[in-house]
Design a protein with these regions (language model features):
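Intrinsically disordered, low-complexity non-transmembrane regions of multi-pass membrane transporters
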Residues: 1, 163-177
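N-terminal membrane topogenic signal
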Residues: 1-9
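Pore- and pathway-forming membrane helices of multi-pass small-molecule/ion transporters and channels
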Residues: 12, 16, 27-46, 92-96, ...
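Structural signature of hydrophobic alpha-helical transmembrane segments
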Residues: 20-35, 78-92
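Cytoplasmic-side transmembrane-helix entry/capping segments in multi-pass membrane proteins
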Residues: 52-61, 84-87, 107-116
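Membrane-interface helix termini and inter-helical loops of multi-pass transporters
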Residues: 74-81, 128-139
Length: 177
């Protein structure tokens, strides 16, 4: 079995399971779209244990930096500036912070940080997101995105392992023939 075929089976089945879990038993507590972003990020970071670590740490760092950026942007500190200018300055500083954080090897995946940052801001801007970025609950978009992305990264890791097993089963069957 080719790698693409094994991945198609693994990701297809696990993607359906993840969607069912997120929309069913987990009752919409987490964001399936953020989980799929992290799942893709896992592969973007090269997979395996190192890709899992880079994805979880990078997306979490990006989410935290986004939360800080959102808090500062809405704190009224830049009230003398036009709102769009103040928000732009805050986002610029947040992005610069992410890139500088990438100097620390554990947080070197700038794309993972950007995915976490963007997902957190997107969730915070959704009209149905009532939470504050300082709450320690699932109403906080930072918390929701970090948890969703951890689950997504784990699904990525499992999908890679399952694809490897499917390829191995195919090779063992060919060896017996």
């Amino acid at each position: 079995m080719s790698l693409n075929t094994a991945l198609a089976i693994s990701l297809g089945v696990l993607g359906a399971v993840a969607t069912w879990l997120f929309l069913g038993p987990l009752g919409g507590m987490l964001a399936i779209w953020a989980a799929f972003i992290a799942w893709g990020c896992f592969y973007h970071n090269g997979g395996k244990e190192s890709g899992l670590q880079s994805t979880i740490l990078g997306t979490a760092a990006g989410a935290v930096i986004a939360g800080i950026t959102l808090k500062v942007a809405s704190a009224g500190i830049g009230a003398s500036l036009p709102a769009n200018m103040w928000v732009a300055i805050c986002v610029g500083l947040g992005v610069a912070a992410m890139v500088l954080l990438a100097n620390v090897p554990l947080f070197a995946s700038i794309p993972a940080q950007v995915y976490g940052f963007a997902s957190t801001v997107a969730m915070a801007l959704l009209p149905a997101t009532p939470g504050s970025v300082t709450e320690a609950s699932l109403a906080n978009p930072v918390v929701t995105i970090i948890l969703s992305m951890i689950v997504g990264a784990i699904f990525g890791y499992v999908s890679e392992k399952v694809a490897g097993m499917l390829m191995g089963m195919d090779h063992r069957a060919a060896a017996k023939a």
